[in-house]
């Protein structure tokens, strides 16, 4: 089809997909997802969602006290997921670099939050975020990051 001038000197194109630049076409889905996941807004969003889930589980403890007495794990799941989101947000700030101090802070947040949420007391009754499990996670992260560095 031909283009017809709308205003003198300006033509209208029937196919707007031709206007897409070559740079936008060359980005693969993986590259676009990588840019989104590495953005600061996404990382802050993770922390905000985490805080929201923790607050939600605390509110549910007051709204549904009968459920909290019989099945406390149902109310602890959003809080645990929230704490994990907060820790992922903290660890991924500053271009993905994770210092030992940040990792130690996240381990303490995870262990303390689980300890408080399971029975309401700080008595080291953790079942999920134990020192052994967290050290395994740390070993896996180190292994995966060394593989990624060797491939690149």
Swiss-Prot record:
Its main location: membrane. The keyword Lyase does not apply. It is a multi-pass membrane protein. InterPro entries: CRPA. This is Sulfur-rich protein. Residues 1-11 have a biased composition (Polar residues). GO terms for cellular component: outer membrane. Residues 12-21 have a biased composition (Low complexity). It comes from Chlamydia muridarum (strain MoPn / Nigg). The keyword Membrane applies. Signal peptide: none annotated. It is found in: Membrane. Keywords: Membrane, Transmembrane, Transmembrane helix. The chain crosses the membrane at residues 44-64, 73-93. Residues 1-21 are annotated as: Disordered.
